[in-house]
């Protein structure tokens, strides 16, 4: 499992330009899964059902995870739309992203080279407008401790920006926390050392 964080879109972006009387409208959106990506493509197709083409590409997972890539030329000559769109996304180092480029035909043919430039260029320009945030990969841990150790435990949780998901105050205190994977080792060592190994840390199976 790759636990390194990666960038994802913060909000949807739209970029429009006219090339030889054809209007190209590029949309970028955050799509965490292949299903979300296809749903976004469908929504743009419905919005622009009168357009000649709605070409698309997506990176539905990590930027480098080619198993979750997809693209379509949507009637344009093979290799002139979907691949250039995907190439721009794959090179952006942004994950969970879908691009749809809508074309309203203006009567002048662009040729294969012109189409590649138009579709890839639209995504390139839209990416310049895109705001991103870092997605951290997290894991859930179970903490079991005595009541006297609650203040110490909560202090260490705050230090590592751990989120309390559940809390059960019975004979002992049981916390389920969510923590960035990169912090797990340091968090575990810190809480064991400072509590004298009296806080029991275990992985939560219900991830």
Spans of model-derived segments:
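C-terminal regulatory domains involved in ligand/effector binding and gene-expression control
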Residues: 1-79, 166, 202-207
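Active-site beta-strand/loop microenvironment that shapes enzyme catalytic pockets
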Residues: 81-129
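Terminal alpha-helical anchor/extension segments at protein ends
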Residues: 116, 122-127, 195-207
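Short glycine-/aliphatic-rich beta-strand segments at the starts of folded cytosolic domains
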Residues: 132-147, 175-177
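Short amphipathic alpha-helix segments
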Residues: 143-162
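Short amphipathic alpha-helices in soluble, non-transmembrane regions
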Residues: 153-159, 186-195
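N-terminal positively charged helical leader segments and presequences
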Residues: 169-172
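Terminal, non-globular segments
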Residues: 177, 183-184
